[in-house]
Amino acid sequence: MKSLVLLLLVAVTVSSVVSKPLPEDSEAEVHKEFETWKVKYGKSYPSTEEEAKRKEMWLATRKKVMEHNTRAGNGLESYTMAVNHLADLTTEEVPKGLLPMPRPEEEEVDKEFEMWKTHNGKTYNSTEEEAKRKEIWLATRARVMEHNKRAENGSESFTMGINYFSDMTFEEIPKARLMVVFPTRDGGEEAEVDKEFETWKVQHGKNYGSTEEEAKRKGIWLATRTRVMEHNKRAETGSESFTMGMNHLSDKTTAEVTGRRLQDGEEAEVHKEFETWKVKYGKTYPSTVEEAKRKEIWLATRKMVMEHNKRAENGLESFTMGVNHFADLTAEEVPRGLFPME
């Protein structure tokens, strides 16, 4: 089948799909839109067969425009498109020189999508379904890339990746465990985690000035590791569309990572919140070093809860979270069975 042409006000994009009216529009509305377009551009055809053929090309162009503009609305494109007088023409019929050259970055992304499909065994029932899934995949990819850019710049303490669920909406991802049980570690497990920490230190050239400093940093590292593991467990069971990983910032606090200290007022408020929480749950610690370590874990828990609740406000989570008496414990320290399961 001949390629179909989308010619915009300032550019042309080629489509190889003959489209039906989009589901949200009635056939009568789309037909009226086509008739209005014909009048606007003085279009007439020698036969009903020719008009039917041209309308199919116009529909494909219209669909492409709407999909592009949806991406633009989501920040995935830097411009919007519109249908003009060449929207019912094939590539061969468009005047020479009006078709744009393919952008290398688009070809690379298309290749990446094809490789991802192959890797995850993805097939779709129609070109329309594939186009829809690709749009979701592109949105996930953009979100992951933006996060990883922040990680490169030191604004995040972990990296993300694409997985099998990256072409699904949040509602479509199988609802699995919202929280994960990590059993209490025995001696062997603890030794494995200690070995993992030592390997991470060597990999990232980490040295600490004292055993107290190392204990503090290990506490932060464990909190980051726990958050990453819980997220990736949800990704495995389908509750997240990407995976995370550790990096050289995993032993740092949020303030250290971002390079931004809390303002005096903010710091005082957070400190007051921590002190209030300690009183509420009867928390005391044997040393200032231990308290500093527990406060870092509490801060990481608080941050995770706040981020989750922000997503809940935006409709991306179906429940809200709160900080409780386990908020200064790592997942390994929380008694077995106390993490909620769906």
From Swiss-Prot:
Function: Inhibits papain and ficin (cysteine proteinases) but not trypsin (a serine proteinase).
Keyword Aminoacyl-tRNA synthetase recorded: no
Modification after translation (UniProt): N-glycosylated, with sialylated biantennary complex-type glycans. O-glycosylated, with sialylated oligosaccharides.
Tissue expression per record: Expressed in the skin, liver. intestine, spleen, pancreas and kidney.
One Gene Ontology molecular-function label: protease binding
Subcellular location, record wording: Cytoplasm; Vacuole
Signal peptide feature range: 1-19
Organism: Salmo salar (Atlantic salmon)
Coiled-coil ranges per UniProt: none
InterPro entries: Papain-like_cys_pep_sf, Prot_inhib_I29
Pfam families cross-referenced by the UniProt entry: Inhibitor_I29 (PF08246)
Disulfide bond entries: none
Taxonomic lineage from the root: Eukaryota, Metazoa, Chordata, Craniata, Vertebrata
Metal-binding recorded as keyword: no
Glycosylation-annotated residues: N153, T184
Superkingdom in the source lineage: Eukaryota
Keywords: Cytoplasm, Glycoprotein, Protease inhibitor, Signal, Thiol protease inhibitor, Vacuole
Major location category of this protein: cytoplasm
Protein's name in the database: Cystein proteinase inhibitor protein salarin
Any one GO CC term of the record: vacuole
